[in-house]
Regions:
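Short beta->alpha linker loops
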Residues: 42-44, 145, 174, 224
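Short active-site-adjacent structural elements
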Residues: 178, 201-203, 227-232, 252-255
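Phosphate-bearing ligand-interacting subdomains
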Residues: 210-233
Length: 256
């Protein structure tokens, strides 16, 4: 869809695309994975028709947030559920966060438990399988978020050990707790600043944040927030300080 973008309609990512045009998450995919095509469009069916009638027809289209999309019947459906808030323990709106009955899980070809704290714990994974009770046609995977080494914004160089004496960790994502925990693990002192999800940073709020910090401070953010800062021309605010983002990858493990 391109949530948070300032445009409408079908757009194919290109060399000149920005987060304002595509949305921050599609823009991040576009920058990180140069060998894939990225498209946004609020009308999924119309967008797919444009893609498959185009000159560069893909073998596979991955549609974000498409499990409950009524206008497109995907040939392979992936259901994500979080370790801390599994659908098996949730309820329908407004009592809980589910948009349909739990029984709707039967449509999934693949179920992924995200944020699994220890993907090597077979006993814990077996307990999850008993809770989900996957059907014969369903595969189950357990995923874990893995943080990479901090990447400098390009101003003052980071220390070779990538640890921080003082850190200001700032993020405009939905659930920043894991990010703050990661920064805390490599910092002696940390100040946490949380913004709303998909927040469009204002130059003045960033200037104030930098001005109020000590000379020993390192500013740390997420890769998604870095993309917004870069596309909005705000990286110059950090040119005379140490600033970096922490990339993530997702590790998948099969069910036991």
């Amino acid at each position: 869809r391109g949530y948070g973008r300032k445009t409408k309609g079908f757009i194919a990512a290109s060399a000149g695309s920005t987060a304002a045009e595509l949305g921050d998450e599609p823009m991040m995919y576009h920058l990180r994975f140069a060998d894939i095509q990225v498209y946004v469009g609020e009308n999924r069916a119309a967008a797919l028709e444009r893609i498959f009638n185009g000159s560069n027809v893909p073998d596979v289209v991955v549609m974000d947030d498409g499990y409950q999309h009524r206008g497109v019947d995907a040939s392979f459906k992936i259901l994500l559920t979080t370790f801390n808030d599994p659908f098996t323990a949730d309820y329908l709106l407004p009592a809980g966060g589910l948009r349909e009955s739990k029984s709707g899980y039967w449509r999934a070809d693949c179920i992924v438990i995200t944020g699994f704290p220890d993907a090597q714990d077979d006993q814990e994974r077996k307990r999850w399988l008993e809770s989900i009770q996957p059907l014969p046609h369903q595969q189950v995977f357990f995923s874990k978020m893995v943080y990479g080494d901090a990447v400098s914004f390009g101003g003052k160089e980071l220390g070779s050990d990538r640890t921080f004496t003082n850190a200001v960790a700032f993020a405009g994502i939905a659930n920043p707790a894991a990010f703050f925990k990661q920064v805390n693990s490599c910092s002696e002192n940390i100040t946490e600043i949380s913004f709303p999800d998909h927040h469009n940073f204002l130059r003045q709020e960033l200037v104030s944040m930098v001005a109020n910090a000590s000379d020993q401070t390192t500013f740390v953010t997420t890769e998604k927030d870095f993309v917004r800062l870069k596309c909005n021309g705000l990286l110059d605010v950090f040119q005379n300080v140490r600033a970096c983002y922490i990339p993530i990858t997702i590790r998948l493990n099969d069910a036991p």
